[in-house]
Amino acid sequence: MSIKEDKWIRKMALAHGMIEPFADGQVNLNPETGEKLISYGLSSYGYDLRLSREFKVFTNVYNSLVDPKRFTEDTFISITDDVCIIPPNSFALAHSVEYFRIPRNVLTMCIGKSTYARCGLIVNVTPFEPEWEGYVTIEISNTTPLPAKIYANEGIAQVLFFEADEICEVSYAERKGKYQKQQGITVPFV
């Protein structure tokens, strides 16, 4: 397996719709206001994805136990805004601005941006499997004892693309993965 470079990512995004919308290069300034942004877009060996304006912030108002087999929407408060405040020692779900279509011979890994990590915010995204497509559901944990702010339409994590030496026998699409073509924020289900 080898990591893919910027030229390959650009070609796959523009010719095959692997990433839509696609920012060809690192964007770190708002083009309208000149304000500094947490960067997003194409980098040397990856692509920095952005958060959308939709968030689900964890609340324990209706639950006393988190059970991944019986998870309900009322576990979260829904927010649509340019920023989201995550309570201390809590977490939020969001989804990417970008829609991804992963080729059959590719697996991705997603790593949180250091800007957030250095503030005590941990980003978790599972791998995008061969032939998976959809908006990425992103989990952001606030490990600090203080409220933490995250920004919509700015970078949150870097996606690394790995090309396999051989094609897999069964892709995510073929095994009818439960998160295939997910739209918006998708909460866990079994």
UniProtKB/Swiss-Prot annotation:
Annotated residues for binding of dCTP: 113-118, 158, 172, 181-182
Please state what class of enzyme this protein is: hydrolase
Q: Per UniProt, which keywords does this protein have?
A: Hydrolase, Nucleotide metabolism, Nucleotide-binding
Question: Which is an annotated Pfam family here?
Answer: DCD
- Write out the GO biological process terms: dUMP biosynthetic process; dUTP biosynthetic process; nucleobase-containing small molecule interconversion
Pathway the protein takes part in = Pyrimidine metabolism; dUMP biosynthesis; dUMP from dCTP (dUTP route): step 1/2
InterPro entries, sorted: dCTP_deaminase (IPR011962), dUTPase-like_sf (IPR036157), dUTPase_trimeric (IPR033704)
Q: Does the keyword Nucleotide-binding apply?
A: yes
Q: What is the E.C. number?
A: 3.5.4.13
Active site per UniProt: 139
Q: Which molecular function terms from Gene Ontology are attached?
A: dCTP deaminase activity; nucleotide binding
Q: Which reaction does it catalyse?
A: dCTP + H2O + H(+) = dUTP + NH4(+)
**Which family does the UniProt entry place this protein in?**
Belongs to the dCTP deaminase family.
Q: What does this protein do?
A: Catalyzes the deamination of dCTP to dUTP.
On assembly, the entry states:
Homotrimer.
Q: Could you tell me what this protein is called?
A: dCTP deaminase
Specify the species. Answer: Chlamydia abortus (strain DSM 27085 / S26/3)
